[in-house]
A protein has these predicted regions:
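Gly/Ser/Thr/Pro-rich low-complexity, intrinsically disordered segments
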Residues: 1-185
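Short, solvent-exposed alpha-helical surface patches in non-cytosolic proteins
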Residues: 186-241
Length: 241
């Protein structure tokens, strides 16, 4: 399951209540939700987890992760000042990256990943299809992704998008929430009030609705003759002829 969208804001969610993605989505109103990074047997996140400047977990590495600053936009950076969640960098600038992986992470497994397109849109990958890191990199590059982070996978892979979901019975301590930017409908052009002369002409039957719709259009000779004919008929009735 993949989706591409213009992201308005994102959030790192610390799931202390062991809620399901559906419960979290219902509480927050996010449009997309996916599982976060790795965790230990005590349900504690590993790597860096920072929420609004508060450090939940940390390690010795200063690698790229999902960084969310004051503008609320998720970016692949090393800045841990706002909110931050570790991930395994697998693509940067359109090139594959390789970090040392433990055997349980390196094996072929279901995958969750976040990617960025050159136009700034987000690409989310959340799928039960078993892939190696190399296969996931190839899939994402084929979709046009230029930066990407791999998150927890295997039995942790789970997410909900507007048009689909991937479920798991496993609860995870961190999740990533996204809000898709709403498409704004263009404001219709204001209706220009009729000029007094045109309004009078319409009331007298001298101007048709079609002519009023294009008040700046030049009048043809035929239309001019028709207008004069109607005007003459009105005068004849008024004068009692």
């Amino acid at each position: 399951m993949t989706d591409f969208f213009d992201c308005e804001r994102a959030q790192v969610y610390h799931n202390t209540g062991k809620l399901s993605p559906a419960q979290i989505r219902n509480r927050t109103g996010c449009t997309h939700i996916i599982n976060g990074y790795l965790f230990n047997s005590k349900f504690q996140p590993v790597g860096w987890t920072v929420i609004d400047g508060k450090i939940i977990s940390r390690d010795a590495y200063q690698d790229w992760g999902i960084s969310i600053g004051t503008d609320g936009l998720p970016k692949m950076l090393t800045d841990r000042g706002g909110s931050f969640l570790s991930g395994i960098p697998i693509i940067k600038g359109g090139s594959k990256l390789y970090r040392d992986l433990t055997p349980d992470v390196a094996r072929s497994a279901a995958r969750t990943a976040v990617g960025w397109l050159p136009n700034g849109k987000i690409c989310l990958w959340c799928d039960k299809t078993a892939l190696t890191r190399e296969q996931l990199q190839n899939k994402l590059l084929g979709l046009g992704v230029e930066d990407a982070l791999m998150l927890d996978g295997g039995g942790s892979t789970q997410g909900i998008f507007p048009k689909g979901k991937v479920t798991s019975s496993r609860k995870v301590p961190t999740l990533l929430l996204f809000w898709e930017r709403k498409t704004e409908n263009p404001t219709p052009a204001p209706v220009k009030p009729e000029e007094p002369a045109l309004a009078w002409g319409k009331a007298k039957g001298l101007v048709t609705d079609a002519q009023l719709a294009e008040p700046e259009r030049a009048v043809t000779r035929q239309e001019l003759v028709e207008t004069l004919r109607r005007f003459s008929a009105i005068n004849w009735k008024t004068e009692g002829g």
